[in-house]
Curated annotation (Swiss-Prot):
GO biological process, one term: transport of virus in host, cell to cell
An annotated GO cellular component: host cell plasma membrane
Membrane topology classification: Peripheral membrane protein
Protein name per its UniProtKB record: Movement protein BC1
Main subcellular localisation: host cell
InterPro entries: Gemini_BL (IPR000211)
GO molecular function: DNA binding
Post-translational modification: Phosphorylated.
S-S bridge residues: none
Protein's cellular compartments: Host cell membrane; Host microsome membrane; Host endoplasmic reticulum membrane
């Protein structure tokens, strides 16, 4: 950031000297001049913030008559990540003299470093890399305010100074404002995995059973505190309709015993000899019945 001798808040522009730049395929910065350190501290003591009202980029080519290529000028906000720092971009032919006017849409604090960065690069050019191809001059118009306010987007202004080119030869891109999305902090009573009834699953604590925790109509909370648990379990005046399974864990084991399991019960399996006798008896009865039917037919 170079020193600037003028006042911070006025109708004048903070101008840089017209500098020559070399052709490159990589992004290179264009010099910007912001208020001096003393002027920044003066505005900071006044408790104000600042914004760039207007930025002007004056491009004057220094290339041969038949030079080809596209110049890309990008305005970046260094307060954002590198992938999302680009705020606007211009593209125009390398031989086209043009003035680019861009209007800012955000405030910045003087406690931060210079928020803006303007870079350029050249693509698809027949000019040799490293050649001094243009003079570029940047101008900024700044203003201060007690606090930030909403700024409406204002489209850029493009002044083409070369007669062989029209506005169709210049393109402009600007970043879009993200749509506001509300983020919920705590879900309400009608949200979450149990939106209809509002009931929550029973959470058992150490020393508790499902029978002691089961109740009817308790939708606000299914958890007993350490102070409330003894009174609920031992209070004989509590309604049995509210806690129908309260004393279930106190029943004797015999009342809840379903009996022996299949593996413990006596096996009724038949021996191989018994099965063979049943089969032989069945076959004999079938043969006798068939012979009786034949004799009756004769």
């Amino acid at each position: 950031m170079e020193n600037y001798s003028g006042a911070v808040v006025n109708n004048k522009y903070v101008e840089t000297k017209s500098c020559e730049y070399r052709l490159t395929n990589n992004e290179m910065p264009i010099k910007l001049q912001f208020p001096s350190y003393l002027e920044q501290k003066t505005v900071q003591i006044m408790g104000k913030c600042m914004k760039v009202d207007h930025a002007v980029i004056e491009y004057r080519n220094q290339v041969p008559f038949n030079a080809k290529g596209t110049v890309i000028v990008t305005i970046r906000d260094t307060r954002l990540s590198y992938e999302q720092a680009a705020q606007a971009a211009f593209t125009f032919p390398i031989a086209c003299n043009v003035d680019l006017h861009y209007f800012s849409s955000s405030f910045f604090s003087l406690k931060d470093e210079t928020p803006w960065e303007i870079v350029y690069k050249v693509e698809d050019s027949n000019v040799i890399d490293g050649t001094t191809f243009a003079q570029i001059k940047a101008k900024l118009k700044l203003s201060s305010a007690k606090h930030s306010t909403d700024i409406r987007f204002k489209p850029p202004t493009i002044n083409i100074l070369s007669k062989d080119y029209t506005e169709e030869c210049v393109d402009f891109w600007s970043v879009e404002k993200p749509k506001p999305i509300r983020r919920m902090l705590n879900p309400g009573p009608n949200q979450g995995p149990y939106p209809i009834s509002g009931h929550r699953p029973i959470m058992l604590q150490p020393g508790e059973t499902w029978a002691t925790r089961s109740s009817i109509g308790r939708s606000s909370s299914m958890r007993y505190t350490n102070n409330d648990r003894p009174s609920i379990l031992d209070n004989t005046s509590a309604s049995d309709a509210d806690y129908p399974l309260r004393h279930l864990h106190k029943l004797p084991e015999a009342s809840l015993d379903p009996g022996d399991s299949v593996s413990q019960s006596h096996s009724n399996a038949m021996s191989k000899r018994e099965i063979e006798d049943i089969i032989e008896t069945t076959i004999s009865k079938c043969l006798i019945s068939q012979r009786s039917n034949v004799n009756k037919a004769l």
